[in-house]
Design a protein with these regions (language model features):
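Extracellular glycan-interacting surfaces
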Residues: 1-620
Length: 620
């Protein structure tokens, strides 16, 4: 018996913390060079905060280290602005809808002051890919918000005033000329929709300091097949000494966000345009449609000009991945410099991005921003849904594309497992990328959660292993976006190095079969799994979407060759009502499994027959 007298006080253990290096992994939503200071460069990410590049150490520095779980708003930046005259100043807007801020720094983000915004903001909502939407000019801050239209502050964010844009609340971009007299604003067109499915006008111009706006020529709506909403929304804007250029995109199959969803972050765009404008007598006028190809099913988004060269990207191109174009005649003609794996050389310096792990293709997608360096016309940066990339060789034509992610870690870690022994030390399951099995703590993982062809599974919700044989692991991934892997239950016998997909438990019930049909579609949750302590029984709460129903829990003793359905009863032995559960095994007793009932009054089920039946127990 342990008492105070015989207790032994152990010496404190000193822990050292670091991160397992993955590299990139998430959506970089915008790139911001300072126009005159060659050592000031920022990016924003959808869920990973703002980063500043350290040119001396050649790595990205994370600026949200002080963020807490109680107030995570800075991890969701929506827009960045800089002071053209003072490279030390940094402004960015951020929010999680509950807390919404304009953040101001006088030392490049080392110290940040938050001031509350009068509108809802979220850096991981639809529209995050467009911009820019924050401007600092002549002591004023201008913000094109997602929910309150255009607002501005003359006292560094202490107070804000609204500017009416024909009732439009969802702004996609704002831009002003060097003198701050000419303004252009893009919007979703929702407020002026004639019928609820066709956007109203989406592009406006002001020449009187934002006192009034007039419509600026924009593409007419096109009723694309399979499109949910019709009409083109401005995505990005750039200018040079001769022209202003604006990219547009038209929604595809929008599954969320309604007409407020207008950018690549809905995952589908039906069409795109690139328009060129000129300034006549202080007024912006339409000059020419310079769209490279009207017949490609995609949008156009990233665009940048330095006066000599114009760069442009497609976004959400359905077949072959996004393309990058260059023009040296203001868009009169275009040259492709990247199309899938063609036209450019690639240096895949991050292992999981290699084509052989991505169906033999290019992992680049969601190019919504591209920026030429103001200080090196041979170099440009572009964003993707899996990190930041650099282009070099633009002047010579020997174009090299490579990830530029050193220091950027923007992955969603859904669970992590340590192995007591085995060839790998850490099993890390991740949103979007699936998972990695790390042999050691100091090097990147080559590739892990993939099928026999190297095609990656994505977004595992959980995994399980036994203490007796940690080489034997089960996991529940989604099938990837290309359809080259299908979701379900996967099994590894070599500690996560290789995987096989187990047969589906079809025929147990129509309810389960419907869920299995859904799981075979791209990017659908497959469920929750657990394995008995002796490694001989695998449990699976089948999902096929959100939640893990207790009516869809099954088990196998022969790695999926045959399946049986688990039975759930309440504390009286009657059939339990349907609700979601998560299954867990006892790590020592092979007969014991537990199920946590995810409902308003949380419940606990226990199985003493290896998961065949679960009975609810009373808990206090």
């Amino acid at each position: 018996m342990v008492t105070e007298k015989n207790m032994k006080l152990l010496s404190p253990v000193k822990y050292e913390y670091g991160n397992l290096k993955i590299g990139g992994g998430g959506f970089v939503t915008g790139i911001t060079f300072h126009p005159t200071d060659s050592k000031t460069l920022y990016i924003r990410t959808d869920i990973g905060g703002v980063y500043r590049y350290d040119f001396d150490k050649q790595t990205w520095t994370y600026l949200a280290d002080k963020v807490t779980a109680d107030d995570p708003a800075q991890t969701y930046p929506l827009a960045i602005a800089l002071d053209e005259k003072d490279p030390n100043k940094l402004f960015f807007t951020c929010g999680d809808k509950r807390s919404n801020y304009i953040c101001i720094s006088d030392d490049k983000g080392e110290n940040i002051i938050q001031k509350t915004l009068p509108c809802s903001v979220h850096g991981n909502e639809v529209g995050r890919a467009t911009g820019d939407r924050l401007i600092y000019k002549n002591g004023r801050l201008y913000f094109g918000s997602q929910t309150a239209g255009i607002i501005y502050s003359e006292d560094m964010g202490e107070s804000w005033q609204s500017i009416d844009l024909f009732g439009e609340k969802n702004i996609s971009l704002i831009w002003t000329d060097s003198e701050g007299k000419l303004f252009i604003a893009g919007c979703s067109g929702e407020a002026n929709s004639p019928d609820g499915v066709t956007r109203g006008h989406t592009l406006y111009c002001s020449t009187d300091g934002l006192k009034s706006f007039v419509p600026l020529t924009a593409p007419d709506p096109v009723k694309y097949e399979n499109s949910s909403y019709y009409g083109f929304v401005p995505q990005r804007i750039t200018s040079d000494s001769r022209y202003i250029y604006i990219t547009f995109a038209s929604s595809g199959e929008v599954f969320y966000g309604g007409m407020g969803a207008y950018a690549c972050d809905t995952g589908s765009l039906s069409g795109g345009k690139v328009y060129r404008y000129r300034i006549e007598n202080g007024v912006t006028v339409f000059d020419k449609d310079i769209t490279p190809d009207d017949h490609i099913p995609c949008g156009y988004s990233g665009i940048c000009s330095n006066g000599k060269m114009l760069l442009l990207s497609t976004v959400c191109r359905k077949n072959g991945g996004d393309m990058i174009y260059t023009s040296t005649d203001s868009g009169e003609s275009w040259k492709i410099i990247m199309n899938g794996l063609e036209y450019s050389r690639f240096d895949w310096n991050i292992p999981y991005m290699k084509p052989r792990y991505n169906g033999g293709g290019n992992c680049v997608h969601w190019i919504s921003d591209i920026k030429l360096s103001p200080f090196d016309s041979d170099t440009a940066l572009f964003n993707t849904g899996t990190g930041l990339f650099m282009i070099t060789g633009l002047a010579s034509g020997d174009v090299l594309v490579k990830p530029f992610c050193e220091g950027i870690e923007e992955t969603v870690h859904l669970n992590v497992y340590t192995t007591p022994h085995g060839r790998n030390r850490i099993i890390d399951i991740i949103g979007d990328l699936g998972g990695f099995a790390f042999k050691d703590y100091d090097s990147e993982c080559e590739n892990s959660f993939a099928n026999e062809n190297g095609d990656r599974y994505i977004t595992c919700l959980n995994a399980d292993l036994t203490l007796s044989d940690p080489e034997y692991i089960v996991a529940t991934p989604r099938g990837n976006w290309t359809g080259k892997t299908k979701g379900g239950l996967i099994l590894s016998k070599d500690c996560g190095s290789t995987w096989e997909r187990l047969p589906m438990p079809r025929g147990l019930s129509e309810f389960i079969d419907q869920k299995l049909d859904n799981i075979e579609k791209p990017n659908v949750d497959s469920g929750w799994t657990a394995i008995s302590a002796d490694g001989k029984r695998i449990m699976w709460a089948v999902a096929g979407g959100r939640g893990f129903s207790n009516k869809a829990v099954c088990y196998t003793d022969d790695e999926g060759k045959t399946w049986q359905k688990s039975i759930f009863t309440d504390s009286s032995g009657n059939s339990a009502d349907e609700h979601n559960v998560k299954i867990f095994s006892d790590y020592y007793n092979s007969e014991l499994f537990f199920a946590i009932a995810e409902r308003e009054n949380l419940g606990l089920y226990i199985s003493r027959d290896k998961g065949a039946t679960f009975r609810e127990v009373s808990i206090k």
